[in-house]
């Protein structure tokens, strides 16, 4: 814009705009002379504005006051820069006419702009919400006695550390304005609507609504349910039931003290701790004596406790509660804190007496503790508890799983000494539970217990190590304590990884209830948890840290225990947490260098994807080397306990593993997968034993491999037989070792000893193509290919078919600097594509990623073509011969001679390779073959064009270009093969097109033959040249290249002329479409080699709009032929390019079939009336243009790649786009056909457009408010209304008398009555939505317009009382339930329009000073607050 708005500031862009009868507000981004960005709020007051001058001044006064960073450094307020005011002269005093307020600019946007990002993460997390909450509490505390903000909403908080902005609605506390209606509809507290006066709790309401909105937006699998309950309490309809700022601060400080060291992510924001410290340092968390703290209760076995954290996991009925603190103990603690602060000079006995007195006054009653007794002699109720809660049926599967996990820990000799200590576990038993056991303090609901049973595990969090070190001074945490904690975790994780179930190991890594505890030595009298008597010792809190155990003995003499992550279900996925992350519990605050070395080695080994047991063994070996040094440095610290356990662990493990104990982890080689590069889960151990060398290949859960069990003996015999081949360098199979405990197979092969000495040279991950020249790499490639072909020939003489089994290639650098091939058979049988991939593997190993090669030229192009050919042939072979298992109408036939021929044909530099053993056969059988239908074709070449794979499409496909030769006739074809994502079908349909339609100047070429089924489609063309796709011309990423547009229009022309015989995939001769560029080119190749554009209409529409029209093409064709559609949207959105292109205009204007359907609208905007309404000129006539909708689902698809409103979209949000298909298969969602795209009939939704055409069909005589036409452009739907000069809305009219008002009232009542008869209620009647026109005789006519939020009768009930609309004209029952009638809800909604009409008339009466008693009484009756007393229309 660059328009100077005020002072030195230029407008950069408009952010928001708002206007009502009193004022107009515009928010701009502006630039100063230095091009720095600022926010400018422009406020323009109307001539009849009711806002007094003091209120106008408060716009900048409050902001300026609280922007003082010296006085208020802790407030995150949008900082005031300066302001400008423009005055209007009046007789009595000067009023502000305009004002401009300049504030700082924050580029994070406001909270309302937060959207879902990539994969399963969101742009804001739970920790961010809590940090925002804490920052708002700091601001509210400062505002508590000064001002009320009155407009807390997402639009008012900036995302960039979070700043509160827009203090325009704020007011002084306890002033005359305390009952003024100001704020944003969705966030206005009910007490504002009642106009009975209010305090700062209305800001609590608005903040609660904002936090709930954010919580719902970021809600993930696990969240703290307590936060949701707290936010709902803040949104209570009664102001007296909402917590105060002081209560909220006290609650959040207690919550921080109790859960910040647990797995809750509430306080993960790095600045949250600073907010808590601010509260504590200023003693803001200490309540006054008469203020009761917030209590959110949890009911356990009929007893109530105050809860600070509750996580509800969404998997398999699993629940647990963290850190339950008994209400009585908490009251004692609060009273102790209060009394201690008020009476610092009293002695301990006086404090105890005060505590007891306060306890009698404030406690809700004693809590029985008998059910928590550990034994008959000792009463031990922990004041701090962790409750592991497993909801399951006693005797059921889940119950047995959870119980078996506990028994596993108790029976393990190793774990018995490492975990489950008396001081940790208080109780474990199955008891009745309540389905909904979390209630707020004021909840009176009585929920009967169910018959379901559960397992409770009560643990004492007083000894939690994370909490312990959090409250401990940094200097007291010594190196030996840190080492003992790390050693303890190493022993625990090894025992679970070696002998425990996988899902327990995964849960342990993810820290689900897995907790490390520090216990005082047994020689010391252990501090007991308090018993609820008159002499109870207060529970440690933020003001009394838990450090009593550290003061009585040296910290190094404490012991560690572990509570395992017991689960009532089996993990179905592997943990994403790495071992080095699990062990890193101290961050950067380590006190011993060995810990740094442990974490560094663990991180390196994590990358190798070695089994956890093997990683830990290496860690222990490194630790053992430092044994003497550590025992000398940290004497009498208990480290010898861990070293003794390490030695026992290593001895037992090596004794158990007869062969695998010999494994040297420094000698490991990974296997290669052709398409997925290096496989980190497939590898060999290379070991040495008795002067022989072995390769040990581990496999987990081998029974999952298809056909292995039933063919196991045959397969192993063949492996043994292969090892006798004299010339092939193969791994000699020795035996298979089975580990029953871990359900793992170890395949042992004997290898040449020299391989053991060159293992590091063999590692494929370290092979670099930059170490050799281009010629050297080609020489290496030749050598390896010769070896491989000769080996294949020998293998073929011993085995009927080499294609039934796949094998792994190992490439070794020998002593003479030559590379040699070694082989080992894969344990995955029946992989026919393995043979082809072996050639691809060699090329990939030698040349690396060809796409990243720096050198260019013909040789690189040919290498790329060859390897691409092998990869495509491998994929086709796998699908046809394996997945299909013979149930397909197409199949691949090939042998090693074919691969050799393609090698020489596509890589001419290898023509000097001589392989005499089969050289004489080459002329007779040189091509691989494909059978399509019942016809055989030679495969001349295979090409993968530039195409985008889309995993969401139901008919998404891989496109391959096949150059084929029909064996019977030697005819050559270009075949385009599409691979759908469906299971193979043997039945096929063959379509022959004897007379292809080339009537469009021979530009469009149809296929001559189509063979297809539900799974694959082969389309044959008699052309020879280069095939390109629309992606080759999609440089702007919007498919608006002129070649694409011309092809699109040509195809539409072909489509309308031949709707009955249309094929959806055709070729266009690029030389004829883009003849201007071709003719002007000096490139001889472009003129001599034909080029064709593959235009697939299915693919084009899918890429543009996400719509699959494959199964609904007839419906789609009818839509685009009869009315505006996405096709006309494409044309209209590209009208400038089309109008300037002779070919495009010739197609549209000179073809009747096109001209009647598609036309270009040149609409020029004359004036912008509102963000969605413009005065325009079209075809020399004036119109009102209004945006009445958008292709909403298409917009959503373009942004997210899927329709998130679909009920299964949670799969996308959870797993991300990459893993959606596999996730859907796991969740059984694959059968929902509508999931993959947008239904044709649903892509364009506009409720207003439907209503407008419905009204037009019911009216006998059209008027100037009737829609004349609509069109689509840039994915938006625009309606066009005729414009009549002299018309205006009622807010703009300047002269009305009493008779005019009566006439207007009559007309509007009649129109609302008509709407009611048609089943429509308007929902936004106001002066701005009523158009008036005065005739020459003085008469006036009015019409209701703008049906943007109108509703049909019978729609969802929640829409009836939606807060959409204009505040000040909405019926009060929208905001207050008690004002709603008891009758039929479907009739009450029309009374809302009556109320809005009454408010509109009241506005006009006041504006024109109408004193008619009759009219005023009539309007008063229309605006009665109770629905039963309002007039009917």
Swiss-Prot record:
<feature type="compositionally biased region" description="Low complexity">
    <location>
        <begin position="332"/>
        <end position="362"/>
    </location>
</feature>
<comment type="similarity">
    <text>Belongs to the protein kinase superfamily. Ser/Thr protein kinase family.</text>
</comment>
<feature type="domain" description="Protein kinase 2">
    <location>
        <begin position="1177"/>
        <end position="1433"/>
    </location>
</feature>
<feature type="binding site">
    <location>
        <begin position="1"/>
        <end position="4"/>
    </location>
    <ligand>
        <name>ATP</name>
    </ligand>
</feature>
<dbReference type="Pfam" id="PF00069">
    <property type="entry name" value="Pkinase"/>
</dbReference>
<feature type="domain" description="Protein kinase 1">
    <location>
        <begin position="1"/>
        <end position="272"/>
    </location>
</feature>
<dbReference type="GO" id="GO:0004674">
    <property type="term" value="F:protein serine/threonine kinase activity"/>
</dbReference>
<keyword id="KW-0067">ATP-binding</keyword>
<protein>
    <recommendedName>
        <fullName>Probable serine/threonine-protein kinase DDB_G0277989</fullName>
        <ecNumber>2.7.11.1</ecNumber>
    </recommendedName>
</protein>
<feature type="active site" description="Proton acceptor">
    <location>
        <position position="151"/>
    </location>
</feature>
<dbReference type="InterPro" id="IPR000719">
    <property type="entry name" value="Prot_kinase_dom"/>
</dbReference>
<keyword id="KW-0418">Kinase</keyword>
<feature type="binding site">
    <location>
        <position position="41"/>
    </location>
    <ligand>
        <name>ATP</name>
    </ligand>
</feature>
<dbReference type="GO" id="GO:0106310">
    <property type="term" value="F:protein serine kinase activity"/>
</dbReference>
<dbReference type="InterPro" id="IPR011009">
    <property type="entry name" value="Kinase-like_dom_sf"/>
</dbReference>
<keyword id="KW-0547">Nucleotide-binding</keyword>
<feature type="region of interest" description="Disordered">
    <location>
        <begin position="332"/>
        <end position="366"/>
    </location>
</feature>
<keyword id="KW-0808">Transferase</keyword>
<keyword id="KW-0677">Repeat</keyword>
<keyword id="KW-0723">Serine/threonine-protein kinase</keyword>
<dbReference type="GO" id="GO:0005524">
    <property type="term" value="F:ATP binding"/>
</dbReference>
<feature type="compositionally biased region" description="Low complexity">
    <location>
        <begin position="533"/>
        <end position="550"/>
    </location>
</feature>
<feature type="region of interest" description="Disordered">
    <location>
        <begin position="521"/>
        <end position="550"/>
    </location>
</feature>
């Amino acid at each position: 814009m660059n328009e100077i708005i005020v002072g030195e500031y230029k407008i950069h862009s408009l952010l928001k705009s708002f206007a009502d009868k009193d004022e107009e507000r515009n928010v701009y981004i502006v630039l100063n002379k230095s091009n720095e960005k600022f926010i400018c709020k422009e406020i323009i007051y109307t001539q009849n504005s009711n806002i007094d001058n003091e209120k106008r001044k408060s716009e900048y006064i409050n902001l300026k006051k609280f922007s003082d960073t010296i006085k208020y450094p802790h407030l995150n307020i949008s900082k005031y820069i300066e302001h400008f005011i423009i005055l209007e002269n009046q007789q009595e005093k000067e009023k502000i006419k305009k004002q401009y307020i300049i504030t700082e600019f924050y580029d994070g946007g406001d909270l309302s702009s937060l959207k879902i990002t990539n994969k399963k993460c969101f742009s804001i997390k739970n920790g961010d919400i809590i940090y925002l909450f804490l920052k708002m509490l700091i601001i509210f505390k400062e505002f508590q006695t000064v001002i009320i903000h009155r407009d807390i909403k997402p639009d008012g908080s900036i995302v960039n550390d979070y700043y509160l902005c827009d203090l325009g609605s704020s007011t002084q506390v306890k002033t005359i304005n305390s009952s003024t209606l100001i704020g944003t509809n969705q966030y206005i507290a009910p007490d504002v609507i009642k106009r009975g006066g209010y305090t700062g709790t209305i800001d609590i309401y608005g903040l609660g609504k904002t936090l709930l909105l954010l919580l719902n937006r970021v809600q993930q699998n696990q969240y703290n349910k307590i936060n949701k309950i707290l936010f709902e309490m803040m949104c209570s309809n009664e102001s007296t039931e909402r917590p105060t700022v002081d209560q909220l601060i006290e609650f959040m400080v207690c919550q921080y003290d109790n859960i910040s060291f647990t797995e809750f992510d509430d306080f993960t924001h790095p600045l949250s701790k600073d907010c808590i410290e601010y509260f504590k340092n200023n003693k803001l968390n200490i309540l006054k004596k008469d203020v009761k703290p917030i209590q959110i209760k949890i009911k356990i076995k009929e007893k109530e406790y105050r809860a600070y954290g509750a996580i509800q996991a969404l998997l398999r009925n699993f629940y647990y509660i963290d850190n339950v603190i008994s209400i009585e103990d908490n009251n004692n603690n609060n009273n102790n804190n209060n009394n201690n602060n008020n009476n610092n000079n009293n002695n301990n006995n006086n404090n105890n007496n005060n505590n007891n007195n306060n306890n009698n006054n404030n406690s809700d009653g004693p809590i029985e503790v008998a059910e928590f007794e550990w034994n008959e002699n000792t009463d031990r109720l922990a004041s701090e508890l962790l409750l592991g809660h497993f909801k399951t049926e006693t005797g059921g599967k889940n119950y047995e799983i959870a119980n078996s996990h506990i028994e596993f820990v108790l029976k393990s000799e190793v774990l018995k000494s490492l975990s489950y200590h008396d001081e940790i576990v208080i109780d474990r038993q199955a008891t009745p539970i309540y389905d909904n056991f979390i209630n707020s303090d004021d909840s009176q609901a009585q929920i009967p217990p169910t018959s379901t049973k559960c397992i409770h595990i009560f643990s004492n969090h007083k000894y939690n190590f994370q909490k312990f070190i959090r409250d401990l001074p940094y200097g007291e945490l010594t190196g030996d304590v840190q080492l003992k904690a790390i050693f303890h975790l190493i022993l625990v994780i090894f025992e679970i990884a070696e002998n425990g179930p996988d899902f327990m190991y995964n849960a342990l890594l993810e820290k689900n209830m897995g907790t490390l505890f520090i216990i005082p030595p047994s020689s010391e009298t252990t501090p007991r948890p308090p018993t609820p008597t008159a002499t109870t010792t207060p529970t440690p809190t933020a003001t009394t840290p838990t450090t009593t155990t550290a003061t009585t003995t040296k910290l190094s003499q404490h012991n560690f225990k572990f509570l395992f992550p017991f689960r009532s279900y089996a993990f179905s996925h592997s943990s994403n947490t790495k071992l080095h992350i699990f062990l890193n519990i101290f961050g950067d605050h380590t006190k011993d260098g060995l810990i740094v070395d442990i974490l560094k080695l663990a991180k390196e080994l994590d990358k190798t994807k070695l089994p956890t047991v093997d990683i830990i063994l290496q860690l222990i070996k490194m630790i053992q080397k430092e044994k003497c040094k550590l025992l000398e440095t940290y004497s009498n610290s208990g480290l010898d306990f861990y070293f003794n356990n390490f030695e026992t662990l290593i001895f037992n493990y090596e004794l158990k593993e007869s062969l695998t104990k010999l494994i040297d982890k420094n000698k490991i080689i990974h296997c290669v997968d052709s398409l997925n590069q290096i496989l980190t889960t497939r590898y060999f151990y290379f070991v040495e034993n008795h002067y022989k060398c072995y390769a040990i290949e581990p496999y987990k859960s081998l029974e999952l491999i298809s056909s292995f069990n039933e063919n196991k003996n045959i397969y192993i015999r063949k492996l043994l037989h292969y090892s006798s081949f004299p010339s092939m360098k193969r791994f000699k199979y020795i035996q298979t070792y089975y580990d029953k405990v871990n359900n793992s197979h170890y395949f042992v092969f004997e290898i040449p000893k020299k391989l053991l000495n060159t293992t590091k040279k063999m590692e494929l991950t370290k092979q670099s193509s930059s170490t050799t020249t281009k010629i050297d790499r080609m020489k290496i490639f030749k050598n390896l290919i010769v070896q491989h072909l000769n080996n294949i020939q020998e293998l073929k003489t011993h085995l009927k078919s080499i294609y039934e089994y796949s094998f792994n290639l190992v490439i070794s650098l020998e002593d003479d600097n030559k590379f040699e091939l070694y082989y080992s058979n894969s344990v995955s049988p029946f992989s026919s594509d393995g043979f082809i991939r072996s050639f691809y593997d060699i090329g990939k190993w030698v040349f690396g990623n060809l796409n990243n090669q720096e050198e260019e030229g013909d040789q690189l192009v040919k290498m790329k073509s060859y390897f691409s050919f092998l990869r495509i042939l491998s994929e086709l072979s796998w699908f046809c011969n394996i997945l299909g298992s013979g149930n397909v109408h197409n199949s691949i036939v090939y042998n090693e001679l074919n691969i050799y021929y393609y090698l020489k044909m596509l890589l001419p530099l290898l023509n000097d390779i001589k392989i005499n053993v089969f050289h004489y056969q080459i002329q007779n059988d040189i091509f691989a073959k494909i059978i399509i239908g019942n016809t055989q074709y030679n495969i001349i070449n295979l090409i993968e064009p530039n195409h985008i794979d889309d995993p969401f499409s139901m008919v998404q496909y891989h496109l391959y270009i096949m150059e084929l030769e029909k064996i019977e006739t030697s005819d050559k074809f270009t075949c385009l093969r599409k691979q759908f994502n469906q299971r193979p079908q043997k039945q096929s349909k063959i379509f022959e097109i004897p007379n292809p339609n080339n009537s469009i100047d021979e530009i469009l070429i149809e296929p001559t033959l189509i063979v297809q089924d539900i799974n694959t489609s082969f389309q044959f063309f008699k052309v020879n040249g280069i095939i390109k796709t629309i992606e080759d011309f999609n440089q702007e990423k919007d498919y608006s290249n002129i070649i694409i547009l011309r092809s699109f229009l040509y195809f539409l022309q072909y489509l309308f002329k031949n709707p009955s015989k249309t094929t959806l995939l055709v070729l266009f001769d690029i030389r004829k479409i883009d003849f201007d560029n071709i003719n002007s080119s000096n490139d001889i190749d472009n003129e001599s080699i034909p080029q064709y554009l593959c235009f697939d209409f299915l693919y084009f529409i899918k890429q543009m709009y996400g719509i699959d029209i494959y199964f609904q093409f007839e419906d789609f064709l009818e839509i685009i032929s009869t009315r505006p559609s996405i096709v006309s949207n494409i044309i209209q959105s590209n009208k400038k390019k089309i109008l300037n292109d002779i070919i495009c205009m010739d197609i549209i204007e000179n073809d009747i079939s096109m001209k009647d359907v598609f036309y270009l609208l040149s609409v020029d905007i004359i004036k912008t009336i509102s963000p969605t309404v413009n005065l325009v000129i079209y075809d020399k006539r004036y119109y009102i243009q209004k945006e009445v909708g958008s292709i909403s689902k298409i917009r959503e698809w373009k942004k997210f790649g899927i329709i998130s409103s679909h009920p299964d979209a949670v799969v996308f949000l959870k797993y991300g786009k990459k893993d959606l298909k596999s996730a859907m298969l796991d969740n059984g969602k694959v059968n929902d056909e509508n999931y993959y795209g947008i239904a044709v009939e649903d892509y364009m939704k506009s409720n207003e457009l439907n209503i407008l055409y419905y009204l037009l069909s019911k009216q006998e005589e059209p008027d100037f408010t009737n829609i004349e036409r609509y069109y689509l452009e840039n994915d938006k739907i625009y309606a066009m209304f005729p414009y009549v000069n002299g018309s205006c809305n009622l807010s703009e009219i300047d002269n009305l008398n009493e008779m005019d008002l009566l006439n207007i009232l009559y007309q509007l009542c009649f129109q609302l009555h008509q709407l009611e008869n048609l089943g429509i209620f308007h929902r936004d009647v106001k002066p701005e939505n009523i158009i008036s026109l005065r005739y020459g005789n003085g008469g006036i006519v009015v019409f209701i317009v703008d049906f943007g939020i109108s509703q049909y009768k019978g729609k969802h009930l929640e829409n009836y009382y939606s807060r959409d609309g204009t505040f000040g004209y909405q019926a009060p029952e929208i905001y207050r339930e008690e004002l709603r009638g008891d009758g039929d809800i479907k009739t009450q909604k029309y009374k809302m329009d009556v109320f809005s009409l009454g408010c509109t008339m009241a506005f006009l009466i006041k504006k024109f000073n109408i004193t008619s008693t009759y009219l005023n009484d009539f309007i008063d009756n229309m605006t009665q607050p109770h629905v039963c007393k309002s007039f009917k229309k």
